[in-house]
Amino acid sequence: MRVIAGSFRSRKLIAPRGSGTRPTSDRLRETLFNILAPRIAGCRFADLYAGTGAVGIEAISRGAEHVWFAERAEPALAAMRANLTALKIMQGFTVEERGTGALLERLAKLAMKSSEAAEPVRARELIDLVYLDPPWEAEAEYEKTMGLLGSARGRSILVPGAMVVAEHSSKVPLPERFGELVQTRTLKQGDAALSFYALAVE
Protein backbone atom coordinates (compact mmCIF):
# COMPACT_ATOMS: atom_id res chain seq x y z
CA MET A 1 0.00 0.00 0.00
CA ARG A 2 1.39 3.39 -0.98
CA VAL A 3 0.53 7.05 -1.49
CA ILE A 4 -0.50 7.48 -5.13
CA ALA A 5 0.38 11.11 -5.90
CA GLY A 6 1.29 14.47 -4.44
CA SER A 7 4.00 15.49 -2.01
CA PHE A 8 4.22 11.97 -0.51
CA ARG A 9 3.97 10.13 -3.82
CA SER A 10 5.11 6.47 -3.73
CA ARG A 11 5.71 6.50 0.02
CA LYS A 12 4.70 3.22 1.63
CA LEU A 13 1.87 2.94 4.15
CA ILE A 14 1.40 0.17 6.68
CA ALA A 15 -1.76 -1.70 7.65
CA PRO A 16 -2.42 -3.85 10.72
CA ARG A 17 -2.05 -7.58 10.27
CA GLY A 18 -5.10 -9.81 10.07
CA SER A 19 -8.52 -9.37 8.53
CA GLY A 20 -9.88 -6.78 10.96
CA THR A 21 -9.08 -3.90 8.60
CA ARG A 22 -9.82 -3.76 4.86
CA PRO A 23 -7.85 -0.82 3.45
CA THR A 24 -9.09 0.83 0.26
CA SER A 25 -6.99 -0.64 -2.54
CA ASP A 26 -4.38 1.50 -4.29
CA ARG A 27 -6.27 1.08 -7.57
CA LEU A 28 -9.60 2.21 -6.12
CA ARG A 29 -7.94 5.10 -4.29
CA GLU A 30 -6.34 6.23 -7.54
CA THR A 31 -9.72 6.09 -9.29
CA LEU A 32 -11.33 8.05 -6.46
CA PHE A 33 -8.75 10.83 -6.50
CA ASN A 34 -8.75 11.07 -10.28
CA ILE A 35 -12.42 12.03 -9.92
CA LEU A 36 -11.90 14.30 -6.91
CA ALA A 37 -8.72 15.96 -8.24
CA PRO A 38 -10.27 19.37 -9.08
CA ARG A 39 -11.71 19.61 -5.56
CA ILE A 40 -8.76 18.54 -3.38
CA ALA A 41 -6.38 21.50 -3.17
CA GLY A 42 -7.32 23.63 -0.16
CA CYS A 43 -10.33 21.50 0.77
CA ARG A 44 -11.49 20.29 4.20
CA PHE A 45 -11.76 16.50 4.02
CA ALA A 46 -13.35 13.99 6.39
CA ASP A 47 -12.04 10.42 6.29
CA LEU A 48 -14.68 8.44 8.20
CA TYR A 49 -14.06 4.86 9.35
CA ALA A 50 -10.55 5.85 8.35
CA GLY A 51 -8.70 2.62 9.15
CA THR A 52 -5.03 3.14 8.31
CA GLY A 53 -5.73 6.71 7.19
CA ALA A 54 -4.65 5.98 3.60
CA VAL A 55 -7.47 7.98 1.99
CA GLY A 56 -7.04 11.02 4.24
CA ILE A 57 -3.26 10.90 3.86
CA GLU A 58 -3.73 10.84 0.08
CA ALA A 59 -5.84 13.99 0.44
CA ILE A 60 -3.11 15.67 2.52
CA SER A 61 -0.48 14.63 -0.02
CA ARG A 62 -2.53 16.29 -2.77
CA GLY A 63 -2.98 19.58 -0.92
CA ALA A 64 -6.03 19.33 1.34
CA GLU A 65 -6.08 22.14 3.91
CA HIS A 66 -7.33 19.96 6.77
CA VAL A 67 -8.31 16.31 7.20
CA TRP A 68 -10.45 14.86 9.97
CA PHE A 69 -9.80 11.17 10.60
CA ALA A 70 -12.44 9.19 12.51
CA GLU A 71 -11.48 5.71 13.71
CA ARG A 72 -11.86 3.86 17.01
CA ALA A 73 -10.30 0.42 16.39
CA GLU A 74 -6.96 0.42 18.20
CA PRO A 75 -4.96 -1.64 15.64
CA ALA A 76 -6.08 0.67 12.84
CA LEU A 77 -5.40 3.78 14.94
CA ALA A 78 -1.87 2.55 15.67
CA ALA A 79 -1.23 2.02 11.96
CA MET A 80 -2.68 5.44 11.12
CA ARG A 81 -0.51 7.22 13.66
CA ALA A 82 2.55 5.28 12.46
CA ASN A 83 1.83 6.34 8.88
CA LEU A 84 1.39 10.00 9.84
CA THR A 85 4.59 9.91 11.89
CA ALA A 86 6.60 8.16 9.16
CA LEU A 87 5.57 10.86 6.69
CA LYS A 88 6.30 13.58 9.27
CA ILE A 89 2.79 14.99 8.98
CA MET A 90 2.54 17.09 12.12
CA GLN A 91 -0.32 19.47 11.36
CA GLY A 92 -3.35 19.93 9.14
CA PHE A 93 -5.25 17.00 10.57
CA THR A 94 -7.39 15.93 13.53
CA VAL A 95 -7.86 12.35 14.75
CA GLU A 96 -11.14 11.50 16.50
CA GLU A 97 -10.52 8.25 18.39
CA ARG A 98 -14.15 7.89 19.50
CA GLY A 99 -15.23 7.18 15.95
CA THR A 100 -17.35 8.64 13.19
CA GLY A 101 -20.47 9.45 15.19
CA ALA A 102 -18.46 11.35 17.78
CA LEU A 103 -16.69 13.43 15.13
CA LEU A 104 -19.88 14.40 13.31
CA GLU A 105 -21.65 15.30 16.55
CA ARG A 106 -18.66 17.36 17.65
CA LEU A 107 -18.61 19.31 14.38
CA ALA A 108 -22.40 19.75 14.42
CA LYS A 109 -22.25 21.22 17.92
CA LEU A 110 -19.51 23.63 16.87
CA ALA A 111 -21.57 24.68 13.85
CA MET A 112 -24.64 25.22 16.03
CA LYS A 113 -22.72 27.36 18.51
CA SER A 114 -21.27 29.42 15.68
CA SER A 115 -24.68 29.91 14.05
CA GLU A 116 -26.01 31.31 17.32
CA ALA A 117 -23.10 33.73 17.61
CA ALA A 118 -22.75 37.07 15.88
CA GLU A 119 -20.13 35.66 13.49
CA PRO A 120 -20.86 32.96 10.90
CA VAL A 121 -19.49 29.42 11.09
CA ARG A 122 -15.74 29.40 10.75
CA ALA A 123 -14.58 27.90 7.46
CA ARG A 124 -12.46 25.26 9.15
CA GLU A 125 -15.55 23.78 10.80
CA LEU A 126 -17.18 23.11 7.44
CA ILE A 127 -16.40 20.09 5.28
CA ASP A 128 -16.00 20.07 1.49
CA LEU A 129 -15.51 16.34 0.96
CA VAL A 130 -16.54 13.32 3.01
CA TYR A 131 -15.31 9.78 2.41
CA LEU A 132 -16.70 6.88 4.38
CA ASP A 133 -15.76 3.23 4.27
CA PRO A 134 -17.45 1.26 7.05
CA PRO A 135 -17.22 -2.54 7.15
CA TRP A 136 -19.21 -3.50 4.06
CA GLU A 137 -21.49 -5.82 5.99
CA ALA A 138 -22.37 -3.11 8.54
CA GLU A 139 -25.52 -1.77 6.85
CA ALA A 140 -26.54 0.03 10.03
CA GLU A 141 -23.35 2.12 9.91
CA TYR A 142 -24.15 3.33 6.40
CA GLU A 143 -27.72 4.16 7.41
CA LYS A 144 -26.64 5.98 10.57
CA THR A 145 -23.81 8.01 9.07
CA MET A 146 -25.40 8.84 5.73
CA GLY A 147 -28.66 9.59 7.51
CA LEU A 148 -26.91 12.06 9.79
CA LEU A 149 -25.04 13.73 6.93
CA GLY A 150 -28.31 14.06 5.02
CA SER A 151 -30.17 15.61 7.95
CA ALA A 152 -30.41 19.29 8.82
CA ARG A 153 -27.86 18.67 11.57
CA GLY A 154 -25.44 17.07 9.14
CA ARG A 155 -26.05 19.71 6.50
CA SER A 156 -24.84 22.33 8.97
CA ILE A 157 -21.27 20.97 8.73
CA LEU A 158 -21.17 20.67 4.93
CA VAL A 159 -20.35 23.53 2.59
CA PRO A 160 -22.73 24.25 -0.29
CA GLY A 161 -21.61 21.97 -3.11
CA ALA A 162 -20.09 19.42 -0.72
CA MET A 163 -19.61 15.87 -1.96
CA VAL A 164 -20.01 12.66 0.05
CA VAL A 165 -18.49 9.43 -1.26
CA ALA A 166 -19.27 6.01 0.22
CA GLU A 167 -17.24 2.90 -0.52
CA HIS A 168 -19.28 -0.30 -0.38
CA SER A 169 -19.66 -3.77 -1.87
CA SER A 170 -20.46 -3.69 -5.58
CA LYS A 171 -23.01 -6.43 -4.88
CA VAL A 172 -24.98 -4.29 -2.40
CA PRO A 173 -26.21 -0.98 -3.86
CA LEU A 174 -26.82 1.95 -1.55
CA PRO A 175 -30.11 3.91 -1.52
CA GLU A 176 -30.36 6.73 -4.03
CA ARG A 177 -31.22 9.19 -1.27
CA PHE A 178 -30.42 9.75 2.39
CA GLY A 179 -32.45 12.76 3.50
CA GLU A 180 -30.99 15.76 1.67
CA LEU A 181 -28.16 13.70 0.13
CA VAL A 182 -28.90 12.54 -3.41
CA GLN A 183 -26.84 9.94 -5.27
CA THR A 184 -25.29 11.35 -8.44
CA ARG A 185 -23.29 8.36 -9.70
CA THR A 186 -21.95 4.93 -8.75
CA LEU A 187 -18.68 3.52 -10.02
CA LYS A 188 -17.93 -0.19 -9.69
CA GLN A 189 -14.44 -1.69 -9.63
CA GLY A 190 -14.26 -5.41 -8.93
CA ASP A 191 -15.83 -6.22 -5.56
CA ALA A 192 -15.88 -2.54 -4.55
CA ALA A 193 -18.09 0.36 -5.54
CA LEU A 194 -18.00 4.11 -4.94
CA SER A 195 -21.30 5.96 -4.65
CA PHE A 196 -21.21 9.75 -4.91
CA TYR A 197 -23.76 12.00 -3.21
CA ALA A 198 -24.47 15.73 -3.29
CA LEU A 199 -26.81 17.91 -1.27
CA ALA A 200 -30.20 18.40 -2.86
CA VAL A 201 -30.71 21.86 -4.32
CA GLU A 202 -33.00 23.94 -2.11
Regions found by a protein language model. Give the residues of each.
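Class I S-adenosyl-L-methionine-dependent methyltransferase catalytic core
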Residues: 1-202
